[in-house]
Every structure is written in C-alpha cells, then in structure tokens.
C-alpha cells in the first residue's frame, strides 16, 4: 500500500490504528506529512505513542474522526483507507465525498465487497491506475490506487457483463484482453 502513495504530498490515513503507514512514509521521506485519523480513542492513543516514539510529532497529526469528517477539503493529497470491509470504505467515501473528491488519489484496501468498491470508483469518475494484492498470514488483500478523472470512455464501449467481470476481477489489465463490446452482444 505504502508504495502506491505518490511522493511529496500530505497523506490522510483514515482508520490509522497504529499509524504504521504514515510513520514509515515520513521516515522514508516519501511524504511531507500525514494526518492519522481513527474513530476510536484507543487506536488513536496507540498511534500517538508510535508517532512520539518515532519523534515525528512535527510531521504527523492525529485526529479523532468518524471517517473523513475531521478532514478539510484539499487538506490531503492522498487518502488511505485500508484494513476494513468494502461496505465501510464505501460509507466513508460516500459520507466524506466532498472531502475525498478533493484528494489527488485514493489508496484503498477493501477486505470484502471489492467489486462494490470498484463499481463505486467507476461510477464516481475515478480511474484505478494501480492494483495489486498482498498475502499476509495466508490471507489475500487487494489494494488499489484510484485518481479522479473525466469520464473514462473505455467503459462506454463495454457491455454490462464485461463491466461486471471487471468489477469482480479488476479492471487494470482489461485493456490487454479482447473483450466483447456493446456492438457484439
């Protein structure tokens, strides 16, 4: 996930838990700073301890926040939402749309309902520019980097079945396939 974050910006980590990702990115000087946010005080306190231990209080702020509610528009270049179910990610994106849509990129790691997350991104004019999967302790976790774009005309050329397949299995490599278009159905 951390490798998907664009260099040089400010990261908002929604649901930060331990703040490991913001800490690692600041230490590597990949980002200027971060806003580590969590809905629960316990995880946020752990994040604050880790940030203090790394001596990065000057670079990483913490905020108690339900989703993106404590984030201002244009305050973050990258928004990371990871380690939670797809439905919760969709809730955060929907409730925080006025803020999330101002970020240059979304880095998402849904642990379920992946097809619904892809569908949301497509329907809200995001393009998935990078997608990968990691395996930790025998479990596979997809991750994706999406950027806001004008309407992607590629989707208009595909039939509904092909779009559904891309939502389930991922659209990043669909251009390498010979896919049926609306005219062929």
Which positions does each model-derived feature cover?
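Conserved SAM/SAH-binding beta-strand->alpha-helix loop
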Residues: 40
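Conserved class I S-adenosyl-L-methionine
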Residues: 9-15
């Amino acid at each position: 996930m951390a490798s998907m974050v664009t260099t040089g910006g400010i990261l908002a980590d929604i649901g930060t838990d331990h703040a490991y990702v913001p800490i690692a990115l600041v230490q590597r000087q990949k980002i200027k700073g971060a806003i580590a946010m969590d809905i629960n005080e316990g995880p946020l306190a752990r994040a604050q301890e880790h940030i203090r231990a790394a001596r990065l209080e000057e670079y990483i702020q913490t905020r108690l926040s339900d989703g993106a509610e404590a984030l201002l528009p244009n305050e973050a270049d990258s928004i990371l939402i990871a380690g939670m179910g797809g439905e919760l990610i969709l809730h955060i994106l929907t409730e925080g749309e006025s803020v999330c849509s101002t970020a240059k990129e979304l880095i998402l790691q849904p642990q379920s309902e992946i097809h619904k997350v892809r569908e949301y991104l497509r329907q809200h004019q995001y393009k998935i520019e990078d997608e990968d999967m990691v395996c930790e302790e025998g479990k596979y976790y997809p991750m994706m980097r999406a950027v806001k774009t004008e309407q992607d005309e590629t989707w208009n050329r595909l039939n509904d079945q092909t779009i559904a397949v891309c939502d389930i299995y991922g659209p990043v490599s669909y251009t390498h396939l010979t896919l049926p278009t609306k005219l062929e159905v």
